């Protein structure tokens, strides 16, 4: 895989000398190879760390576990050297080879180099990130599977010494697998939650790519122009996040906001729930803020779905008196209030979340209407700390 990357990345349009993102091009891959040739022992040590990271993620002990796994494999081969049954166990050796090669690729490209992209080349301790685990988890499992096969084979051949030795190695590997499960269970859950939040955030950014600042687009790719180009194609083909039957309301035709408010669109996380948002700070009860979407076609059986919340930073009781969220529909010259909800998470803990709502739009089916979002301060007309957010307002059918 490394050499496929190396060959492909040396050809247009992948090859790029862009100094802002030099990690994947021909010249950089040459640096990775040179580092491996000049520092082979350091790279081997990092490879053992990758093996050990299948059991534990501790900088101080990961190398010891890597040495242990490698030593067990060498002992397994030595004990069964006269009866390896390579043809019979080929699939496990193939998987083992794949796991070892992908681990080596990771070590070569991410464990330090002479250009210092990923730290100094003299590294002897290396922990791969969790996102790389799908490509490095195989060696320990394959070695354990081989130990079971050789243990069974030695029992069939009635070799007492081999049987005892293979059983001992099998027990050691099984113990390592149990330790791996125990040590990585809760960190794995935490990492899964982090990845879920990260993917939700990126999904929200992708859905609204054409209004997102370059800083957010760089979370998808370091070149924002590439994001815009590819996202537009996905949108045209209705693929990925654009495949859903909905109209996301995120590009208003008219706004009247608090003069000091500089941000309209954004991405907000409340607990582990991330949404694209419209920020609408109330002005006053006499001068409502508005966000207007004109000429929105309403399909059959359509519903307006959205979430409302105040930013978690203003949930303290002394910060304001809540916000009223309202939605109006303007149709054929008539304006109708179809939704109104007052929330005050500062004093009502049950509202410290995304509060989900929907409005039935079936009576407007087949027509173009104007949808107006509005916010008002609380009953005391106190607009301080009223950081009001509409979460992913959309029409679904």
From Swiss-Prot:
Species for this entry: Archaeoglobus fulgidus (strain ATCC 49558 / DSM 4304 / JCM 9628 / NBRC 100126 / VC-16)
Subcellular location: Cell membrane
Membrane topology: Multi-pass membrane protein
Gene Ontology CC, one term: plasma membrane
Signal sequence coordinates: none
Bilayer-crossing regions: 62-79, 92-109, 135-154, 167-189
UniProtKB keywords: Cell membrane, Membrane, Transmembrane, Transmembrane helix
Protein name in UniProt: Uncharacterized protein AF_0303
Main location: membrane
């Amino acid at each position: 895989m490394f050499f496929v990357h190396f060959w492909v990345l040396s050809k247009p349009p992948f090859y790029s000398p862009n100094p802002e993102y030099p990690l994947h091009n021909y010249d950089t891959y040459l640096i990775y190879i040179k580092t491996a040739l000049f520092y082979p022992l350091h790279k081997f040590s990092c490879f053992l760390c990758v093996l050990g990271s299948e059991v534990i993620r501790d900088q101080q002990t990961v190398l010891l576990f890597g040495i242990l796994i490698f030593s067990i494999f060498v002992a397994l081969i030595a004990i069964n050297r006269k009866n390896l049954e390579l043809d019979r166990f080929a699939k496990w050796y193939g998987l083992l080879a794949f796991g070892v090669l992908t681990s080596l690729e990771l070590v070569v490209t991410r464990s330090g180099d002479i250009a210092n992209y990923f730290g100094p080349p003299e590294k002897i301790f290396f922990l791969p990130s969790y996102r790389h685990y799908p490509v490095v988890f195989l060696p320990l499992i394959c070695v354990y599977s081989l130990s079971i096969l050789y243990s069974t084979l030695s029992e069939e051949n009635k070799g007492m010494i081999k049987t005892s030795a293979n059983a001992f190695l099998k027990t050691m590997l099984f113990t390592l697998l149990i330790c791996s499960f125990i040590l990585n269970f809760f960190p794995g859950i935490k990492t899964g939650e982090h990845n879920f939040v990260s993917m939700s955030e990126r999904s929200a950014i992708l859905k609204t790519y054409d209004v997102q600042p370059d800083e957010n687009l760089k979370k998808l790719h370091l070149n924002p122009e590439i994001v815009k180009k590819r996202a537009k194609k996905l949108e045209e083909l209705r693929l990925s996040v654009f495949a859903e039957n909905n109209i996301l309301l995120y590009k208003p035709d008219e706004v009247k906001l608090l003069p000091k408010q500089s941000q309209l669109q954004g991405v907000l996380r409340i607990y582990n729930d991330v949404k694209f948002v419209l920020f609408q700070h109330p002005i006053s009860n006499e001068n409502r803020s508005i966000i207007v979407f004109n000429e929105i076609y309403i399909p059959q059986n359509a519903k307006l779905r959205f979430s409302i919340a105040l930013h978690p930073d203003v949930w303290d009781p002394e910060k304001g008196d809540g916000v009223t969220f309202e939605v109006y529909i303007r149709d054929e010259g008539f304006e109708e209030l179809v939704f109104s909800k007052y929330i005050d998470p500062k004093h009502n803990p049950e509202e410290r979340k995304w509060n989900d709502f929907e409005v039935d739009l079936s009576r407007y089916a087949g027509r173009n209407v104007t949808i107006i979002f509005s916010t008002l301060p609380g009953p005391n007309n106190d607009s301080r700390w009223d950081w009001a957010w509409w979460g992913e307002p959309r029409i679904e059918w």
